[in-house]
Design a protein with these regions (language model features):
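Catalytic beta/alpha-barrel core
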Residues: 74-78, 96-102, 168-178, 190-204, ...
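Terminal interaction modules at protein C-ends
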Residues: 1-69, 236-239, 244-246, 278, ...
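Alpha-helical scaffold elements lining the catalytic groove of polysaccharide deacetylases
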Residues: 135-136, 140-159, 175-181, 208-246
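C-terminal domain-boundary segment and adjacent tail
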Residues: 189-201, 259-290
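Hydrophobic faces of well-ordered beta-strands that scaffold small-molecule active sites
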Residues: 71-76, 95-97, 118-124, 167-169, ...
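Active-site beta->alpha N-cap acidic-glycine motif
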Residues: 61-134
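Extracytoplasmic beta-rich ectodomain segments of secreted or membrane-anchored proteins
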Residues: 79, 91-94, 101, 149-163, ...
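Active-site groove signature of glycoside hydrolases
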Residues: 155-175, 255-256
Length: 290
């Protein structure tokens, strides 16, 4: 995963003023009057686009609720800083949380999340391509492990994160590219009745292929909220797709972020904007295809 090992104790960034939060409306230059031929061509293109929209298959797992889109916001790397978790749980939206195993507050965090009726996921550490420079942490899965060692490691991790409904990978750019190892992981998930969320730390991930073969419910991340670790960039990542027709009508959207102070502020400010647009914020488990 393209996660940055940045301090969770970074000083809170002050949010910009309301004036700087809102994008300036840029006036469009006046266009020259189109000729009859240009108008005809434009109308023809518009008709073709409308036909493609009508013919596009609907997502079978997204019920028609009358809302334009549903989104889930998953917060990774939970289990180290309980103060950050407390702030996130105070946000008036059903955020979901991926808890790292074998951390000082893994079990406590999972229990608190569950008591708040929010989704808990096991944030499963996996070997990245940058290992050993970047270490995935306690309970990590490595390609050098036997199948039995992977299953044992997974079970021990799961025991430290109670109430988990699913699993997503922490790092794992190397591990998730190995089909055979991912089949071992998916088999373990199938036995526990868990779903898998691919954080997509590599474009060559074999997670979907393995999940489909074993029959594990699967979902993939659409957008990382906070790659830039910056309030304004995070806020724009949460809202910019609303202006992109290509992203709407293609099923639910999964955002993944981290418990950074700037991300917490961005999510808090984005929630009302999303709802004002008719967007429904839901737990991750509600948008996983079954």
């Amino acid at each position: 995963m393209a996660l940055f090992c940045l301090s969770l104790f970074e000083e809170k960034q002050k949010p910009p003023s309301k004036e700087t939060r809102h994008r300036e409306q840029v006036k469009k230059p006046l266009k020259k009057k189109d000729s009859g031929v240009q108008v005809a061509k434009r109308d023809d293109r518009r008709a073709q686009e409308q036909k493609r929209d009508r013919d596009r298959p609907r997502d079978t797992f997204m019920p028609d609720t009358g809302k334009s889109l549903r989104v889930a916001i998953l917060i990774d790397d939970i289990g180290q800083d309980m103060n950050a978790l407390h702030e996130l749980l105070e946000i008036n939206a059903p955020l979901s949380f991926a808890v790292l195993p074998r951390q000082p507050h893994s079990a406590e965090a999972a229990k608190r999340i569950h008591l708040k009726n929010r989704d808990v996921l096991l944030h499963l550490p996996m070997e990245p391509k940058s290992y050993p420079e970047d270490r995935p942490g306690n309970g990590a899965l490595f390609l050098s492990m036997t199948d039995k060692e992977i299953r044992t490691q997974f079970q021990r991790n799961l025991e430290t994160v109670p109430h988990a409904k699913g699993v997503n990978n922490h790092m794992g750019s190397r591990f998730t590219e190995d089909t055979e190892k991912m089949l071992v992981v998916m088999t373990a998930l199938k036995e526990k009745g868990l779903f898998f969320v691919d954080s997509r730390t590599t474009k060559d991930s074999k997670a979907r292929e393995a999940a489909d073969k074993i029959g594990v419910p699967f979902l993939t991340r659409k957008i990382f909220i906070d790659n830039d670790h910056n309030y304004q960039a995070s806020l724009e990542n949460l809202t910019r797709w609303l202006e992109d027709p290509g992203m709407q009508g293609n099923g639910p959207v999964l955002f993944i972020g981290h418990p950074y102070p700037s991300t917490i502020l961005a999510i808090r400010d984005a929630v009302s904007s999303l709802r004002a647009k008719g967007i429904e914020i839901v737990p991750v488990s509600k948008i996983v295809p079954q």
